[in-house]
Each structure stands twice: as structure tokens, then as C-alpha cells.
């Protein structure tokens, strides 16, 4: 039986246009106004916005090894609640997906428990120790989406160069958390006026930018697609912009929290605002927004990083880095940037859906049209609501945005035409 999404509105040339959508066998088979019902199951949308599903290439699902923070099941429920139909979990788990055995075990857990499409990363080095490279070819054959040691930077240039050479031969991407360990200095936040005022050790911006500068030259030499995770500083933006102008195959992402906040959000020793990379200066903050708009940064990824409440309820120097983002990304960005006229709705959808898929050559996140995969998110753009921890489907709610009032509530998420999330039905 087909499914008919009736009475929704889709984006056409930045205008919302009424269209019904018929789905059959996981694909869109018909679009138009007032389609015949035939024998379709009908879902009434009452004028709500219908978007292609979002693609998040940077999440932490914590399984295996960190199930008290998040599981594949809870993390993908949260993703679906946020409108994401494809997510890519990072390999900083225990064990690390650094072998065929480990990635196959992960694949089985995904098959059993995931509520949305999950494309797992494999690590670059064994156990993410930065020393011995994994078997790139074997891991690709067993479903690795790309290769990253996210959570730490690859410290040795020769290791990164060889990794890029192997990835390039397989037409795979190297995805990098960029951080020179010799420049961290035990920091817990950005090194700047706020860290000095609070007497909390800081991490300088150059810690990130130095490693990006090294890596773009290695990527050029290896002719490898090199993707930079969670860009946070104006220096990093400058390096990436120059590399793109030079024709180097570099792409980059930015998180919602780095687009929304800067270091001045931290007014006391509060680990809910501890993230890596840290919130930096207002100058950095504005550079990130400008870089996204001019294409230096390609898209938005959440870096959804759940932690248990007791882990975050510590001083910043002791608590883990990270905040959750799967369930809050769209409403926060829509409220801040689209509602006030800085961006169009189409731009936001490009950053969350279309461009992540394009950068990694995925068939997901593409525009809604006949023949496309029925990954669909339905959103009430006019509904205002408060972000509350008790409403989260994630096992964790470590975010500074609790209590914010936002617009853009996800009502329904479909993955290949099947309901992954429907408001009020969380079973």
C-alpha cells in the first residue's frame, strides 16, 4: 500500500507551495495538488512544511562502551525527533571500529536498533592511538562511511599523509578533528578574555588552525578529500578559504552551537558550556557565519555529544567536553537565522540536508521530487515551544539551550517512507 502525505507545503524557488506526496516502496512516486487517494494510507499535514530529511555527518552514539550516555536506539530516536534521517556516528567508542570484527559488530547493532539510517565511520588508526593505520580497504568493504579519529587529532604528519594516500586510492574521505596536543595546555575553554577572568585554563585558536594548515598541504600532495570537523576559529577559516582557492579538495562543517554562541555565554565555571572545540571570541563567531554563507564552510553538523548529568556536574577542568544537538539543531537555527530574516528557509535546508549529502556523494538529503528516496521531515514552522530536558528522546540533555523558546517543531520523520518519529508516539 502507498502512503499519501496530504496537505503539506514544499519549498519551490524559496516559496512554500501546497503539494501532496505519494510514497511507494520507499520512494516518492507522485507529487502534485489534490492527488487522488486511490488505496493510499493518508497522513494529513494541515499545511505544515515538508522537507527532505536532514543528514548529520557528525554524531556520537556512544555504543559500544558508553551506553549510560547514549545508545544506538536512543541516539537515533533523538535524531529522528530532530528531523534527521541519516546520521554518521564517530568511532570514539570502546571498542573502536578499527577492524572488520569491530565494525561488523557495530553493523549488527545498527541493524537491530537504529531508527534512522546510520552510516558508521571507521577510525584512521588502531584504537585511535595515532600510531598504526587500520586496514582501509577491508573496512570500506564492510561499510565504513569514511575514516576519522574524531575526539583527537592525528598528531604525526607521516601517519596522516599515509592515511590520506590510502583513502584517496579508495575514493574515501579523511575526516579530521584538528587539534595539536602540544598547544592544548590542559585547557577547558577558549583562551581569551573570559578564560582569564574566570581563571580557567584556555585552549588557543591556533591549536586547531595549525593542524588544518598541515593537513591541507598533505591532502594536496595525496590528492585526497579532506573534511574538517567543527571549525571554530577565524584562523581556521582563513586556512580553509585559501586551500579552496588553491583547488585543494577540502570541505568543512560548523556546529549549531558555534553559530549561535561565543565565549561570553560562559559567565561562571559551568561545564554545560564545555565543548571541543570551545566557544571562541565574537570575532571568531562572526567569521564562522560569514564562512558558511560564502561557501568556505560547506554545511552544518551537530557534533551531538551526550554525557550523563553527573559527568557534566563538575568543574570545567574535570568534566567531559560536549553538548547534545540532534533534537535542537533545526529549531534553534530556524529561530535565530530564518525567523529574523538573516537566512532563507532554503539556505537552512541546504546546510542541514542537501550539502552534507553532496559533499560525501550520498543519495540522501536531495530535493523532494518523483523518484527520490522518501526521507522526509514534516515541521510546524509556526509552533513556538520551550526546549525542556524532559522532552528529550536522547538519554542525555546536556545543553545550554534548555529553557529557550523556539519555533519549528518536528512533527513527523520518515526514512524510506517508514515512520521513524511521529509526535506523541515514541514507542
From Swiss-Prot:
Active-site residues per Swiss-Prot or TrEMBL entry: 303
Pathway: Pyrimidine metabolism; UMP biosynthesis via de novo pathway; (S)-dihydroorotate from bicarbonate: step 3/3
Enzyme Commission (EC) number: 3.5.2.3
Annotated residues for binding of Zn(2+) 2: 150, 177, 230
Alphabetized Pfam families for the sequence: Amidohydro_1
Gene Ontology MF annotations: allantoinase activity; dihydroorotase activity; zinc ion binding
GO cellular component assignments: cytoplasm
Single GO biological process annotation from the record: 'de novo' UMP biosynthetic process
Keywords associated with the record: Hydrolase, Metal-binding, Pyrimidine biosynthesis, Zinc
UniProt-annotated binding residues for Zn(2+) 1: 58, 60, 150, 303
Cofactor(s) essential for the protein: Zn(2+)
Reactions mediated catalytically: (S)-dihydroorotate + H2O = N-carbamoyl-L-aspartate + H(+)
Primary enzyme class: hydrolase
UniProt family annotation: Belongs to the metallo-dependent hydrolases superfamily. DHOase family. Class I DHOase subfamily.
UniProt-listed NCBIfam families: PRK09357.1-2, pyrC_multi
Stated role: Catalyzes the reversible cyclization of carbamoyl aspartate to dihydroorotate.
Protein name as catalogued: Dihydroorotase
Species, as recorded: Macrococcus caseolyticus (strain JCSC5402)
Source organism phylogeny: Bacteria, Bacillati, Bacillota, Bacilli, Bacillales
Gene that produces this protein: pyrC
Amino acid at each position: 500500500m502507498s502512503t499519501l502525505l496530504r496537505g503539506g507545503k514544499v519549498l519551490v524557488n524559496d516559496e512554500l507551495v501546497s503539494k501532496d506526496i505519494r510514497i511507494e516502496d520507499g520512494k516518492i512516486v507522485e507529487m502534485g495538488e489534490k492527488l487522488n487517494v486511490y488505496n493510499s494510507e493518508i497522513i494529513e499535514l494541515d499545511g505544515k512544511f515538508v522537507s527532505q530529511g536532514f543528514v548529520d555527518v557528525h554524531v556520537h552514539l556512544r555504543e559500544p562502551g558508553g551506553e549510560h550516555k547514549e545508545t544506538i536506539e536512543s541516539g537515533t530516536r533523538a535524531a529522528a525527533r530532530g528531523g534527521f534521517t541519516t546520521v554518521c556516528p564517530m568511532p570514539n567508542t570502546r571498542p573502536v571500529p578499527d577492524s572488520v570484527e569491530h565494525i561488523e559488530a557495530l553493523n549488527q547493532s545498527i541493524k537491530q536498533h537504529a531508527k534512522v539510517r546510520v552510516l558508521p565511520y571507521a577510525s584512521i588508526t588502531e584504537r585511535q592511538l595515532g600510531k598504526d593505520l587500520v586496514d582501509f580497504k577491508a573496512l570500506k568493504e564492510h561499510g565504513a562511511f569514511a575514516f576519522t579519529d574524531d575526539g583527537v587529532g592525528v598528531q604525526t604528519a607521516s601517519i596522516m599523509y599515509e592515511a590520506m594516500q590510502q583513502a584517496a586510492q579508495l575514493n574515501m574521505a579523511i575526516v579530521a578533528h584538528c587539534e595539536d596536543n602540544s598547544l592544548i595546555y590542559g585547557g577547558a575553554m577558549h583562551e581569551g578574555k573570559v578564560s582569564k577572568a574566570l581563571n580557567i585554563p584556555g585552549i588557543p585558536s591556533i591549536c586547531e588552525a595549525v593542524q588544518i594548515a598541515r593537513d591541507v598541504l598533505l591532502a594536496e600532495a595525496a590528492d585526497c578529500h579532506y573534511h574538517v570537523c567543527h571549525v571554530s576559529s577565524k584562523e581556521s577559516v582563513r586556512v580553509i578559504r585559501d586551500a579552496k582557492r588553491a583547488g585543494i579538495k577540502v570541505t568543512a562543517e560548523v556546529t549549531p552551537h558555534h553559530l549561535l554562541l561565543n565565549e561570553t555565554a560562559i559567565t561562571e565555571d559551568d561545564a554545560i558550556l564545555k565543548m571541543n572545540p570551545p566557544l571562541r571570541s565574537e570575532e571568531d563567531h562572526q567569521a564562522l557565519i560569514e564562512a558558511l554563507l560564502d561557501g568556505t564552510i560547506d554545511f552544518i553538523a551537530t557534533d551531538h555529544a551526550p554525557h550523563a548529568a553527573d559527568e557534566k556536574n563538575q568543574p570545567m577542568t574535570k568534566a567531559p567536553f560536549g553538548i547534545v544537538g540532534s533534537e535542537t539543531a533545526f529549531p534553534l537555527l530556524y529561530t535565530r537565522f530564518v525567523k529574523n530574516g538573516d537566512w532563507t528557509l532554503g539556505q537552512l535546508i541546504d546546510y542541514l540536508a542537501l550539502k552534507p549529502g553532496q559533499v560525501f556523494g550520498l543519495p540522501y538529503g536531495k530535493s523532494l521530487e518523483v523518484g527520490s528516496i522518501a526521507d522526509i521531515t514534516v515541521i510546524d514552522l509556526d509552533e513556538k515551544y520551550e526546549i525542556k530536558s524532559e522532552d528529550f528522546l536522547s538519554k542525555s540533555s546536556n545543553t545550554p539551550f534548555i529553557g529557550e523558546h523556539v519555533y519549528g517543531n518536528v512533527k513527523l520523520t520518515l526514512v524510506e517512507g517508514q515512520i521513524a518519529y511521529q509526535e506523541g508516539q515514541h514507542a
